[in-house]
Amino acid sequence: MIEAVLLLGFAIPLWAKRVNQFPPGKEALVVHVVAQQFSFNYHLAGPDGQFGRRDALLVTNSNPLGLDPNDPAGKDDIVTTGELHVPVNRPVIAELSSKDVIHDYFVPAMRIAGDAIPGSLIPIWFTPLKTGTYEVICAQLCGLGHYGMKGTLVVDTPQDYQAWLKERAELSGGAQGAAPSPAPGGPQQPQPQQSKQPAPAASPSPGG
């Protein structure tokens, strides 16, 4: 009994320190994860490294994140729904938020989880160690369609990740094509996302 108490007494603070010790922003891939009933939206900065401005007043079905088409910083951004690609062996900082109710971003195979709460920005981080396709689910009851709130996290080789970024940019013309604004003369309509079936679970990554 004493041994168990001592183990927990040392392990919990060390694990908390590990989880909360975020990698430097320049080393990590920063992704904005915006949950909504009943899907996860992903927002990545383009080659300029800057995220475009978002405005709740611009949110529509075709522009789920409310990206401002007049903001130059967002012209090269990438927005996807349901599927996120990340490079293997590179830290990922996922900044979680929600448009409606409380959700929970959960990657079971990697033991990554974090709440997405309206009005809050909650960061979590992890380092994917193996390439593959992993299931993403919402672990918080969020409405009648909760059972179908699923997606995929694809861990690519660095080469495949760069190819995916190039493909997304060519298909959508940056975020302005993937998530257009209703303003006159705005960007193009979003391109359909290709879904992938989850692969067998891989060993979990540290952090999260």
Predicted regions and their residues:
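Non-transmembrane, membrane-proximal soluble domains of secreted or membrane proteins
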Residues: 1-208
